UniProtKB/Swiss-Prot annotation:
SMART domains: Elp3 (SM00729)
Similarity section: Belongs to the ELP3 family.
Cofactor: [4Fe-4S] cluster
Record's cofactor remark: Binds 1 [4Fe-4S] cluster. The cluster is coordinated with 3 cysteines and an exchangeable S-adenosyl-L-methionine.
All copies of domain Radical SAM core, residue ranges: 83-373
Record-given protein name: Elongator complex protein 3
Chief localization: cytoplasm
Source species taxonomy: Eukaryota, Metazoa, Chordata, Craniata, Vertebrata
Length: 548
């Protein structure tokens, strides 16, 4: 046996291995003693002890955790726990770059829109620069949907997230404006990437995806109001799509015209109506700080947006206007004909908007993912939501949207857990239908555990499955960290039976109050078996149950 090597004789790789082993030893000891541990502190100290300038990667630490400690330690090591705090791993994918569909009849794209084949960022999709994290992943995979999915799922796994349930977001301009052949190829590959099967068409891909171990619980597609007509909605139902993100940007007709949107505000209201009657969840993209609006008019449009039954979306993505090189807005800004709000005024505005959000709406995002160096004017802070919430605290207002109150997010940010849970019901009218928002909440601490969106379809419903007295469940979601579909973790809120209880109440309301003979559910492809257990059967793209 040779002498043990001195620290100075060891290679960098050997030192890194010793550092990782030491970090894990400290984590195991802390776990055995029931102590909380600051991982960053441990990594910094241990790296310094072994004379390393760089810290070990989280992926390598997770990979080295001994099998019998994985269950206890990996959740504590998870990078970006918010990624799966809502119970689902979100995988964003991008379709190939293509021109905006309304160029052909308005002659140009929207004044604020970067990206696209004709822009300074020519390898990027419309409305993206190619430097956002999702864009960069898509470009690396040459916009191949299969590779984008496999790489992202693998990445989330390595970071310690459960990828048992996946929701896709299809980004990159107006997907529904692309040729049908390409759309089918794209969606087919998303499903195949999860199931491992090679399908010949979308129907076959969906059939195999239903039985896959990694469940596709939903697909979200970004679209425009003029590409959200009956034929588009029917195609999207066939894909397994459950949520739409519709670019609204402004509720003012003059602003839509001046910014060259290429559609009217009336088209927005009609698309909301058609989409909700088909069972989709509707998320609106809105842009405060557009040209010729001003602060007061901006606040008024959001009051209108949440209170007027012609709008009332289920979700909101708030994208304050950014000035980016190569856009029409950049030229206006350069010549002094457009000026962005000051950073402080923008935080004020976002705080006022968040205070208006009703408890049934979820605010998904508060700013774009565009890297700051590409922004000539507009948002100057990367943490706009946090700043706005802090400003609301000062103003004595609070944000009561779905995301702020979710049990998983509350646990990460405030370490609070629900104590007394009760069923809460809120009814409202939106887009020609009667909406009921059912939720399990802890009203004392204002924490949301699960929600269900029930709608009595309007007589104008165009889907044959939903005609003649049918109610539809547009969303059922129990929040809390992802629990693999087959396991029950008593400390996590998914799989505790809240979903079943919400469905029972929805069936009662549909039968006794709506007078409906059937209840339909727009279900993600991978969750259809969950509804089969409750007596639902597949009818077209919906899971349906007779109530009498």
């Amino acid at each position: 046996m040779g002498k043990p090597k001195k620290k100075s004789d060891l290679s960098r790789a050997e030192l890194m291995m010793m550092t990782i082993a030491d970090v894990i030893k400290q984590l195991v000891e802390a776990h055995e003693e029931g102590k909380d541990i600051n991982l960053n502190k441990v990594k910094t100290k241990t790296s310094a002890k072994y004379g390393l300038s760089a810290q070990p990667r989280l992926v390598d630490i997770i990979a080295a955790v001994p099998p019998h400690y994985r269950r206890a330690l990996v959740p504590k090591l998870k990078a970006k726990p918010i990624r799966t705090a809502s119970g689902i791993a979100v995988v964003a994918v991008m379709c190939k770059p293509h021109r905006c569909p309304h160029i052909s009849f308005t002659g140009n794209i929207c004044v604020y829109c970067p990206g696209g084949p004709d822009s300074d960022f020519e390898y990027s999709t419309q409305s993206y620069t190619g430097y956002e994290p999702t864009s960069m992943r898509a470009i690396r995979a040459r916009y191949d949907p299969y590779l984008q999915t496999r790489h992202r799922v693998e990445q989330l796994k390595q970071l310690g997230h459960s990828v048992d349930k996946v929701e896709f977001i299809v980004m990159g301009g107006t997907f529904m404006a692309l040729p049908e052949e390409y759309r089918d190829y794209f969606i087919r590959n998303l499903h195949d990437a999860l199931s491992g099967h090679t399908s010949n068409n979308v129907t076959e891909a969906v059939r195999y995806s239903e039985r896959s171990n990694t469940k596709c619980v939903g697909i979200t597609i970004e679209t425009r109001p003029d590409y959200c007509l009956k034929r588009h909605l029917s195609d999207m139902l066939g894909y397994g799509c459950t949520r739409l993100e519709i670019g609204v940007q402004s509720v003012y007709e003059d602003v839509a015209r001046d910014t060259n949107r290429g559609h009217t505000v009336r088209a927005v209201c009609e698309s909301f109506h058609l989409a909700k009657d088909a069972g989709f969840k509707v998320v609106a993209h809105m842009m405060p700080d557009l040209p010729n609006v001003g602060m007061e008019r901006d606040v008024e449009q959001f009051i209108e947006f949440f209170e007027n039954p012609a709008f009332r979306p289920d979700g909101l993505k708030l994208y304050p206007t950014l000035v980016i090189r190569g856009t029409g807005l950049y030229e206006l800004w350069k010549t002094g004909r457009y000026k962005s709000y000051s950073p402080s005024a923008l935080v004020d505005l976002v705080a006022r908007i968040l205070a208006l959000v009703p408890p049934w709406t979820r605010v998904y995002r508060v700013q774009r993912d565009i890297p700051m160096p590409l922004v000539s004017s507009g948002v100057e802070h990367g943490n706009l939501r946090e700043l706005a919430l802090a400003r609301m605290k000062d103003m004595g207002t609070e944000c009561r949207d779905v995301r702020t109150r979710e049990v998983g997010i509350q646990e990460i940010h405030h370490k609070v857990r629900p104590y007394q849970v009760e069923l809460i019901r809120r009814d409202y009218v939106a887009n020609g239908g009667w909406e009921t928002f059912l939720s399990y909440e802890d009203p004392e601490q204002d924490i949301l555990i699960g929600l269900l969106r029930l709608r009595r379809c309007s007589p104008q419903s165009f889907r044959p499955e939903l005609k003649g007295g049918v109610s539809i469940v547009r969303e059922l979601h129990v929040y809390g960290s992802v629990v693999p579909v087959s396991s029950r973790d008593p400390s996590k809120f998914q799989h505790q039976g809240f979903g079943m209880m919400l469905m029972e109440e929805a069936e009662r309301i549909a039968r006794d109050e709506h007078g409906s003979s059937k209840l339909a559910v727009i279900s993600g492809v991978g969750t259809r078996n969950y509804y089969r257990k409750m007596g639902y059967e597949l009818e077209g793209p919906y899971m349906v149950k007779n109530l009498y």
